[in-house]
Amino acid sequence: MTIAFQSAVFALIAISFLLVIGVPVALASPDGWSSSKNVVFSGVSLWIGSVLFVGILNSFIS
């Protein structure tokens, strides 16, 4: 169970890093918000799901 928790935390960190880099780049592109809206919303949804998943796994570890 610990390895699953560590993997989930690593995935959360990786997704966070990608969003920190990717969202400003997507918004600064010439097409801006209109072309990258779906990608940003998908990334944020994945991040929220990862936070909830890590929280659930944390309740089993502690």
UniProtKB/Swiss-Prot annotation:
The chain crosses the membrane at residues 8-28, 41-61. One of its GO terms (biological process) is photosynthesis. InterPro entries: PSII_PsbZ, PSII_PsbZ_sf. PSII is composed of 1 copy each of membrane proteins PsbA, PsbB, PsbC, PsbD, PsbE, PsbF, PsbH, PsbI, PsbJ, PsbK, PsbL, PsbM, PsbT, PsbY, PsbZ, Psb30/Ycf12, at least 3 peripheral proteins of the oxygen-evolving complex and a large number of cofactors. It forms dimeric complexes. PANTHER family: PHOTOSYSTEM II REACTION CENTER PROTEIN Z (PTHR34971:SF2). NCBIfam families: PS_II_psbZ. This is Photosystem II reaction center protein Z. It comes from Pinus thunbergii (Japanese black pine). The gene is psbZ.
